[in-house]
Amino acid sequence: MIGCIKTRLRRFLGDETGSAVLPFALWTPLIVGIALSTIEVGALTIRTTQLERSLDETVRTIRLNTDVAYTHEQLKTMICEGTSLLVGCEDTLRLEMVSLDMRDWVDPASRPDCVDTTFQQVTPQRAFSQGIAHEMMLLRACYMYTAFSPASYLANALPSDDQGYTAIIATAAFVHEPSSGGF
């Protein structure tokens, strides 16, 4: 009886059929997770680059058109028109523009206001100041987006709100040039 059990146990342990299934089952989730994270990093990089480029172009327009006082909505529209991949930009972009006093420095808030996607209600701006000639201004844009693949390792590692939106923040500083009244 014991000999029969030993023989069957040796045959079972020596059998190599199906031996490729175990490594495949163990490695597949890791490889798929890495592939999804790679796609997520690419999408995040493209979104960040587009937001930063559009913000820089908008700031350049502000600096060149010294006689124009742009409103919050005009700047938001200019930034959103300068991007092609920021889905729902008008709804999930929030701007903050504050004056920076170089002589009496006060740190701006460390984190800009972002759109609250939980309620999708309009909340007042923390700060949006037009500024005057020779004044240093800080313009921050916060764009909220949903992850390309919520199952990826990167999407799970990024901070997000209750609705699953993640923030991309772009910052630009500029000096209001005086109007070009007559050289």
State each model region's role.
Residues M1-T83:
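Alpha-helical assembly-interface signal, strongest on the long, hydrophobic N-terminal helix that forms
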Residues G3, D56-F183:
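Short, conserved structural patches
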